[in-house]
């Protein structure tokens, strides 16, 4: 799923820099974020009222971009001006009315299309706001909730969880969930985010260590239930999946660790459920060591 991000005008106002972050560091983060968007085929937009934002005290952004005297007074280097110009100029234009509607919808949390806001200064974590690669990941996961089609969901997952490799049969396993995907998707995304952000780095650091210790951390920090199978021999029979290795050869992998989808966490749905996400910590010869997501669906 491709997304569209719009530069947020008031995030370029100097008073928004509550943490006094260095200009160069902010530009590096924003430039890297934009490059990720471009490389993935996403769209970025600019509303031209942005040029009137008070980027420095009493000085509009357009003066900073195009007037060397104002650049000097603001203490902005030539390299920083080039970076700032690149961030602002290399976007499609969006009209005032459309910009205002999108920003209002996002602030009101009434997002129905894959739009979000690309910010310069971003002090607090806000839904659908990003200014770094990490906050962009959060935005992608928030927008993933708009997806109800299983194939679209699976196709979008690698962009939202870059540390994970997904089995090609996931669309079929998702059909076996004990509740409709539309009800379950928030909880599934929460579990995948925990495996991507918490479990995968732990496993990469200590592949030869105890998997149980990694699962304990995943359980505590991810606030979810997870474990190995009780019978290892039975697990080998039931939980062996094939993944393509780096030689494009199918390789069997036992995906015994699993998180427990014990409920949809939807209001009014109190039913205890037995769905699972089965995975493997990863092998260097398969998808460059990403954690392998083998099954999202019913208990196997």
Task: Explain the meaning of each model-derived region.
Residues 1-162:
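Preference for solvent-exposed, low-hydrophobicity sequence contexts
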Residues 67, 73-84, 181-185, 245-248, ...:
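Short, structured coil/loop segments at alpha-helix boundaries
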Residues 272-300:
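Compact beta-sheet-dominated globular domain cores
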